[in-house]
UniProtKB/Swiss-Prot annotation:
Organism per entry: Cupriavidus pinatubonensis (strain JMP 134 / LMG 1197)
Gene Ontology molecular function: ABC-type vitamin B12 transporter activity; catalytic activity
Annotated protein name in UniProt: Cobyric acid synthase
InterPro entries reported in the protein's UniProt record: Class_I_gatase-like (IPR029062), CobQ/CobB/MinD/ParA_Nub-bd_dom (IPR002586), CobQ_GATase1 (IPR033949), CobQ_N (IPR047045), CobQ_synth (IPR004459), GATase_3 (IPR011698), P-loop_NTPase (IPR027417)
Pathway it works in: Cofactor biosynthesis; adenosylcobalamin biosynthesis
Function, as annotated: Catalyzes amidations at positions B, D, E, and G on adenosylcobyrinic A,C-diamide. NH(2) groups are provided by glutamine, and one molecule of ATP is hydrogenolyzed for each amidation.
Active site residues per record: C328, H432
SUPFAM superfamilies with a match to the protein in the record: Class I glutamine amidotransferase-like, P-loop containing nucleoside triphosphate hydrolases
């Protein structure tokens, strides 16, 4: 089990790399995260929902993602509440106190999934959540040491040296653990190191002498990895890219409950695109394309967007010939009305959308979860689309008669998705990952005004990044010592 001294210490990345290292060695390996809290999720082949990181780790392990790899997924809908997804299906909505009381039930799901994986695979590489040293969360813990103790799992502790204080993080974390938990930690990985390793060696020697535990290795800071980010849009992603040769400027407003921002990974990596995320209080700069992202709380995020003064800026953007795309929750914002009569995403009621597309959306009790494939409806050449749907909204109206995509269902029938405005400036779709296929990316960029647009093969970039990550772990970690417990 890989645990971290902090959030974003590199647990997900290390687990992905270890999965590929073990898969290369011919092992049947599966990733596992008992409990994940994230708004970035993926859809499994059987129509379940898991954390995006576990889907990436499954790819690294060269296996199909399965709901057992992330049995408990928490999708925050407010600062104090979340949708609880068990074995891939939304079960209930709870506030923090109610979920704490529910944890014994959640642990049953965790243990059942873990048992199935251990029966099916040679090795299960487990990822913790946040830090095991959160004293207030120790009671009924199912994500870190509470799980490790229950299944008798050895733990490797990862710390991020790039943020500073790495030795305090490691020693302090150990000090907060119980004796049995401390004994369970077999050693350390120091992540994201830049500089001369010889200057770090005295600190490593001190750490090993102080704790009696080995440092399995120091991983360098790896620039340019094209791997799915799990949670918040990190600073490097939010900042101006400053691509000198970029020909198309794309803006994405960052909403409080933005979901599946991995939709923009292909644009982030595209050499012809200058992708920028704008946060609260920032003006909408001149752009060719504005994309309204997915949201876990669409009406609340629509209120936030308006409170920031972005609606007049978007109307001005369209008036001067700019293009707008809405994805999932963003699609719902582009219609006339959003209705939530049962209060699935907050207080019951209705909100006026922007009205740029003629349809209304009603939030239903059952979530649509499916992988999809098809093509762009209005492209000058065949443009294949591949992605997934995760939404509770059902949209109806005449605007949907001019679809954005044609999707091929499993039964062989073709169905319409999304909408496109009569003037061709506004496009909406429920499909996440709409930019991921090279021909779809090329077609959408051409529609947005980029003449000579080229597609980008995000899948190939992701696979190359996994290989590079595995090479780095193999060359910088003492894998023999770290995997010793597996041979017992």
């Amino acid at each position: 089990m890989v645990q971290g001294t902090t959030s974003d210490a590199g647990k997900s990345t290390v687990v992905a790399g270890l999965c590929r290292v073990l898969a290369r060695a011919g092992m049947r390996v599966a990733p596992f995260k008992p409990q994940n809290m994230a708004l970035n999720s993926a859809v499994t082949a059987d129509g379940g929902e898991i954390g995006r990181a576990q889907a990436l780790q499954a790819q690294a392990a060269r296996v199909e993602p399965h709901t057992d790899m992330n049995p408990v997924l928490l999708k925050p809908s407010s600062d104090t509440g979340a949708q609880i997804i068990i074995h891939g299906k939304a079960r209930l909505d709870l506030d923090a106190r109610a979920y704490h009381a529910y944890k014994p039930e959640a642990m049953k799901a965790v243990l059942a999934s873990h048992e199935r994986l251990t029966q099916a695979y040679d090795v299960v590489v487990v990822e913790g959540a946040g830090s095991p040293a959160e004293i207030n969360l120790r009671d009924r813990d199912i994500a870190n040491m509470g799980f490790a103790e229950r299944v008798d799992c050895p733990v490797v502790l990862v710390a991020d040296i790039d943020r500073g204080g790495v030795f305090a993080h490691l020693v302090g974390t150990l000090d907060c653990l119980s004796d049995s938990e401390r004994a369970r930690v077999t050693g350390f990985i120091i992540n994201r190191f830049r500089g001369d390793i010889s200057l770090l060696q005295p600190g490593l020697d001190w750490l090993e002498a102080r704790t009696g535990k080995p440092v399995f290795g120091v991983l360098p800071y790896l620039h340019g990895l094209h791997l799915d980010a799990e949670d918040a849009i990190v600073g490097a992603q939010s900042a101006k890219r400053g691509t000198p040769d970029a020909l198309l400027r794309v803006i994405v407003p960052v909403l409080p409950r933005i979901s599946n921002h991995t939709d923009f990974d292909a644009l982030r990596a595209h050499p012809q695109v200058d992708l920028r995320f704008i946060g609260p209080g920032m003006p909408v700069p001149p752009a060719d394309l504005v994309i309204l992202p997915g949201s876990k709380s669409v009406r609340a995020d629509l209120d936030f967007l308006r409170a920031n003064g972005w609606e007049p800026a978007l109307r001005r953007h369209l008036r001067y010939g700019g293009k707008v795309i809405g994805i999932c929750g963003g699609m719902q914002m582009l219609g006339r009305q959003i209705h939530d009569p049962a209060g699935h995403e907050g207080p019951a009621g209705s909100s006026a959308g922007f009205g740029w597309l003629d349809y209304e959306t009603t939030l239903a009790p059952h979530k649509q979860l499916r992988r999809v494939s098809g093509r762009l409806a209005d492209a000058d050449r065949e443009a294949a689309v591949s992605g997934y749907e995760i939404h509770m909204g059902v949209s109806t109206g005449s605007g949907l008669e001019r679809p954005a995509l044609w999707l091929d269902d499993e039964n062989g029938t073709r169905r319409a998705d999304g909408a496109c405005s009569e003037d061709g400036q506004v496009l909406a779709t429920y499909v996440h990952g709409v930019f991921d296929e090279p021909t779809a990316c090329e077609g959408l960029l051409r529609w947005a005004g980029l003449d000579g647009a080229q597609g980008i093969d995000l899948a190939a970039l992701r696979e190359a990044s996994i290989e590079r990550l595995a090479d780095t772990l193999a060359s910088h970690l003492d894998l023999g010592a770290m995997f010793a417990p597996l041979r017992r």
